[in-house]
């Protein structure tokens, strides 16, 4: 499993909590986070094998995309002082699907030039 932390952002990454709307994917039902003693949100994982791409856009307009194999319940966390302007799940696929396989949900298109369409515009 790849690290859940967005690459290249480190401890100054924007805070983000990602949750999937009910019914969108049977095995991607939402997010659960634990508030630690350091007042940072940390991930708690259940399930296995989903591959997810998440896009973050900071207030300054910079954006980051990364891919990771994540369980069905997940969250991403960083400093609450720099929350992103835009966040969301760009794409997800079950472990049995190839990254190059056609997207299983009709009516979705990607503005990112990726083979994974954006759930946000489905």
From Swiss-Prot:
This is Putative uncharacterized protein UNQ6493/PRO21345.
